Amino acid sequence: MRKTVIVAMSGGVDSSVVAYLLKKQGKYDVIGLFMKNWEEQDENGECTATKDFLDVEQIAEQLSIPYYTVSFAKEYKERVFSRFLKEYTNGYTPNPDVLCNREIKFDLLQKKVRELKGDFLATGHYCRGGLDGTGLFRGVDPNKDQSYFLCGTPKEALSNVLFPLGGMYKTEVRQLAIEAGLATATKKDSTGICFIGKRPFKSFLEQFVPNSPGDIVDFDTQKVVGCHEGAHYYTIGQRRGLNVGGMEKPCYVLGKDMQKNVVYIVRGEDHPLLYRKELIAKELNWFVPLQGSITCSAKVRYRSPDEKCSVYPLEDGTVQVVFDIPVKAVTPGQTVAFYQGDVCLGGGVIAVPMIHQL
């Protein structure tokens, strides 16, 4: 009996190629499923979800596969967006894409897959699953690898997931779409956080979090050098948008004191206080059980390089991560992913103090 695979289709070229490849294999009954997570219009007054769904319809018709749509807009606001706002208000810099994968795509969407009697869920993520269906590996394209965004998803939620693009380069995917004549072959990739789109981040956030003006302080001199409209708008390592003039060197955000509503800056991109030798990570998820301390590498941001480190489990369920070489702009609230070679061991949320303890 043929197995049924549900393809999470976004209206983009990646998920279109996933559906095409699985249909071409001929061993699956392929069903497309479009997931809508956000109701509002973009900065031009257009509903991007509607445009994306029309592309899904077109691809499904090209491939002669059935397709459905499901809205998780209410659940997304409750389980992802509300936490995103809370974290920012408290001075952290969360990664909503990691949270969306855990709470929506590989939880609620998996339930919909079961409702549709699907045996597998397939997505357009550039990563690879383990042979037993419960591991996670980097995608072969180092520029597109998305295992970082899945490091917080429980391994059980990935046990039936197919990643057809994990062994491909983006250029190959795009070329295949062109050769197959897929309607989305030349469609631009989506960028940024889905609910923000192309809008400036600050103008979006101030719709939900009121401005709270305060001082910008030079940490070395403890002198006020500027003012800000809200400490929550700034993240560690940030350079742009500080509006601090008269400095010999570029200024960077060192940290924030949310109780005092102060943003601390330092001068120079190589200022030693911008670098941290260690961090504490919480809310951990492991694909490979942590049996005592380990040596591995870690990514503290999606586009950051791998940093060699040692990981030590602590009694409260968190871990201490000690880097071989100090790492720049370690940011509370961001995701840290752990690797040994191509194997993603797991990940967690960075929970270091806001201000360096000197």
UniProtKB/Swiss-Prot annotation:
Residues 144-146, 301-302 are annotated as: Interaction with tRNA. It is an enzyme of class 2 (transferase). Its EC number is 2.8.1.13. It comes from the Bacteria. GO terms for molecular function: ATP binding; tRNA binding; tRNA-uridine 2-sulfurtransferase activity. Disulfide bonds join C100-C194. The record marks H125, Q334 as: Interaction with tRNA. Gene3D superfamilies: Adenine nucleotide alpha hydrolases-like domains, HUPs, Translation factors. It is found in: Cytoplasm. ATP binds at A8, M9, S10, G11, G12, V13, D14, S15, M35, G124. This is tRNA-specific 2-thiouridylase MnmA. It comes from Chlamydia muridarum (strain MoPn / Nigg).
